[in-house]
């Protein structure tokens, strides 16, 4: 397990009974988490002082119950020094806040790899969401192409870049279907030194294209291999579904990339430390190929 344990503005205070108790800056939220299957006694007194609680609906989706008036959005910081990012938090109708805090452990890893490369690095970030990985790579000196199917989410990423003082960095923000974009990049002969993908379990592209992770991921990894440069630095695949284990993702990277590039592969769960118990809640997995 690789815990994202360097946060100051985010904290997983406690977790039990299918819910997380979280601090986002000064704001306390309760959100459901299907991984939290245990029903231990609540350890934190802040359960009773949450500012907002997300309630799932039996029909899908859900809604927020606000116990005090909150701003529509606010900012939190991640990292320090040259790697410091400022990210905009905003509770959405699907329980998300615009930040997956467990990914901070990967953001720091990408930044270290890019800084250590000692050469110009081009990164492709697929399913880039609100841009945490994109900004971490850009802050470390990379040129980044950020692709996501949601126009609103890409706009959120641009706002995060401005908040982080990175609006002038070489970042292309694209609203596109990721698989179609990679196919076009192959035809154009464009290549990248690093590829990051954070695919959803299920989704739709801007043209109604259907994405189902288990059915589509291997083909996309294979396509991405063809847009890697001759001297690639890394390739990272994230998954949030229990239907795709870390070892399966690593196997796909190993069989797709190692025959051509050599290098090594690894995989692990990523998670968030729980302040009340000292445990770590799993929040998905990452498989990595690196030179």
Which sequence ranges carry the predicted segments?
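Short beta->alpha hinge that forms the Motif I/post-I loop of the SAM-binding pocket
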Residues: 128, 148-152, 216
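S-adenosyl-L-methionine
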Residues: 150-196
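Conserved SAM-binding loop of SAM-dependent methyltransferases across substrates and taxa
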Residues: 130-144
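S-adenosylmethionine
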Residues: 178-258
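Conserved alpha-helix/loop element of class I SAM-dependent methyltransferases that forms part
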Residues: 101-119
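Non-catalytic substrate-recognition/targeting regions of SAM-dependent transferases
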Residues: 8-22, 29-101, 108
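C-terminal catalytic and target-recognition region of SAM-dependent MTase-like enzymes
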Residues: 232-291
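Conserved class I S-adenosyl-L-methionine
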Residues: 118-129
């Amino acid at each position: 397990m690789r815990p994202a344990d360097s946060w100051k503005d985010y904290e997983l205070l406690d977790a039990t009974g299918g819910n997380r108790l979280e601090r986002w800056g000064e704001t306390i939220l309760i959100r459901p988490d299907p991984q939290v299957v245990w029903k231990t006694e609540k350890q934190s007194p802040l359960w009773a002082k949450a500012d907002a609680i997300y309630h799932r609906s039996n029909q899908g989706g859900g809604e927020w119950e606000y116990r005090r008036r909150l701003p529509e959005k606010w900012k939190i910081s991640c990292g320090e020094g040259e790697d410091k990012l400022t990210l905009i938090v905003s509770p959405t109708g699907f329980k998300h806040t615009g930040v997956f805090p467990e990914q901070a452990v990967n953001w720091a890893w990408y930044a270290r790899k890019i800084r250590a490369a000692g050469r110009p690095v081009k990164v492709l970030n697929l399913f880039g969401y609100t841009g945490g990985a994109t900004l971490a790579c850009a802050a470390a000196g990379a040129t980044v192409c950020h692709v996501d199917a949601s126009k609103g989410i890409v706009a959120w990423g641009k706002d995060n870049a401005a908040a982080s003082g990175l609006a002038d960095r070489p970042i292309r923000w694209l609203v596109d279907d990721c698989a179609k974009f990679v196919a076009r990049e192959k035809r154009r002969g464009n290549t990248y030194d690093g590829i990051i993908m954070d695919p959803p379990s299920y989704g739709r592209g801007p043209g109604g294209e259907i994405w189902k992770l288990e059915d589509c991921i291997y083909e996309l990894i294979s396509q991405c291999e063809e847009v890697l440069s001759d001297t690639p630095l890394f390739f990272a695949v994230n998954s949030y579904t229990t239907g795709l284990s870390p070892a399966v993702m690593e196997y796909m990277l190993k069989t797709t990339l190692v025959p051509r590039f050599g290098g090594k592969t690894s995989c692990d769960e990523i998670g968030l430390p729980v302040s009340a118990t000292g445990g770590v809640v799993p929040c998905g997995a990452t498989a990595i190929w690196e030179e």
